[in-house]
C-alpha cells in the first residue's frame, strides 16, 4: 500500500480535467517520516507549552460557590450543548426533536456516499460537501446563539 494518495488515471473524465490544467500534477510528499516524525511533535509540544504558559500566567478561577436556594429563572446547559438544547426547545413534539437530532449523524454519514463520484480533495471542487458543511456551520451557530436568548426571541435572534 502506498503512503501517497494517487488518483485513478484510467478515468477519462479525470484525464480531460488534468489536460486542461485542472487538478494536481504533484501529489505531495510522503507523510512518513516528514510529517509524523518532525511536524507533529513540534505542534504538540508547542500546544502543550502554550497551554502550560497560559495556565501559569493566568489561572482560571473555580467560580462562585453554588447556592442551592437561588435557582435561576432559566437553566441553560453548557455552551457546547446550546444547539441541541435549542432544537429540543423549539420543536413542539419532543419525539420529533429526538428524531431530528438522530438525523444529524445519519446525514454526516451519508455525505461521503453522496459525494463519492468526485475524485478531488479541494473543497472548491466538491460543491455538495462544501455546501453541507457551510449550511451546518451557519445553522449550528444560529441555534447556539438562539439558545442563549429567551424563548420568545430565540427563533428570530431578537432581530425582528
UniProtKB/Swiss-Prot annotation:
InterPro entries according to UniProt: Cyt_b/b6_C, Cyt_b/b6_C_sf, Cyt_b6/f_cplx_suIV, Cytochrome_b_C_euk/bac
GO molecular function: electron transporter, transferring electrons within cytochrome b6/f complex of photosystem II activity; electron transporter, transferring electrons within the cyclic electron transport pathway of photosynthesis activity; ubiquinol-cytochrome-c reductase activity
One Pfam family hit: Cytochrom_B_C
Topological relation to the membrane, as annotated: Multi-pass membrane protein
Example GO BP: photosynthetic electron transport chain
Assembly with partners or alone: The 4 large subunits of the cytochrome b6-f complex are cytochrome b6, subunit IV (17 kDa polypeptide, PetD), cytochrome f and the Rieske protein, while the 4 small subunits are PetG, PetL, PetM and PetN. The complex functions as a dimer.
Matches recorded under NCBIfam families: cytb6_f_IV
Family to which the UniProt record says this protein belongs: Belongs to the cytochrome b family. PetD subfamily.
Function, in words: Component of the cytochrome b6-f complex, which mediates electron transfer between photosystem II (PSII) and photosystem I (PSI), cyclic electron flow around PSI, and state transitions.
Name of the protein in question: Cytochrome b6-f complex subunit 4
Organismal lineage: Bacteria, Bacillati, Cyanobacteriota, Cyanophyceae, Synechococcales
Amino acid at each position: 500500500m502506498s503512503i501517497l494518495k494517487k488518483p485513478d488515471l484510467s478515468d477519462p473524465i479525470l484525464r480531460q480535467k488534468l489536460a486542461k490544467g485542472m487538478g494536481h500534477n504533484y501529489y505531495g510528499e510522503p507523510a512518513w517520516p516528514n510529517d509524523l516524525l518532525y511536524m507533529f511533535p513540534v505542534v504538540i509540544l508547542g500546544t502543550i507549552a502554550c497551554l502550560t504558559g497560559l495556565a501559569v500566567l493566568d489561572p482560571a478561577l473555580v467560580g462562585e460557590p453554588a447556592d442551592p436556594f437561588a435557582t435561576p429563572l432559566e437553566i441553560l446547559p453548557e455552551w457546547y450543548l446550546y444547539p441541541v438544547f435549542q432544537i429540543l426547545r423549539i420543536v413542539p413534539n419532543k419525539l420529533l426533536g429526538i428524531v431530528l437530532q438522530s438525523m444529524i449523524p445519519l446525514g454526516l454519514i451519508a455525505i461521503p456516499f453522496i459525494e463519492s463520484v468526485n475524485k478531488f480533495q479541494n473543497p472548491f471542487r466538491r460543491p455538495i460537501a462544501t455546501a453541507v458543511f457551510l449550511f451546518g456551520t451557519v445553522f449550528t451557530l444560529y441555534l447556539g446563539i438562539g439558545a442563549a436568548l429567551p424563548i420568545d426571541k430565540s427563533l428570530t435572534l431578537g432581530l425582528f
